[in-house]
């Protein structure tokens, strides 16, 4: 056991309630600027991507390969407590709290100056869809993803699970559609809007501009 670890065996412990709130309430995540990541692989990816670690929880009696020294707080959870705070039934024996990255549009300015291709998601509603799009964006070499007026929290547990690590690999920014368009225009981006129409141009036939913004509309439209 880590020499500075704290054993928590009661599900009524305030720290346990804090974790549960972060998992279940987007308002808690936003107000505290924190999110929960489960599983050794995902936690290690977050650390490697320079996400700021806050605390880690490990099941009592288990061993993990994560470098726990980077976490200011280390908790050892009883089986009962771990079952309470684990969002997924298949979670490996580690759960961690990280500070969420700055997703404000102001934080995107330096990146937009050097980016060549970005993706804009308009009003996305489903965590699974966002996770899948993030994976595709990483595979396609997209430089950043912008969420315009999203209906979901990008740092919710279902997005993190469905992104399978992609959330740590690509910069993400959130804002209203009009402001996002203003920022992109200031950096000379050309918009390309996706459309399921027989007269739409194939992506393989388009001569892409030097700075490209691909826009995906809402799922229901």
Where in this protein do the model-derived segments appear?
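Short acidic-hydrophobic, aromatic-tinged amphipathic segments that line or gate anion-handling sites
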Residues: 7-10, 75-78, 170-180
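Alpha-helix capping/helix-boundary segments
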Residues: 41-43, 62-63, 81-82, 151-152, ...
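Active-site/ligand-binding-proximal alpha/beta "capping" segment
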Residues: 193-221
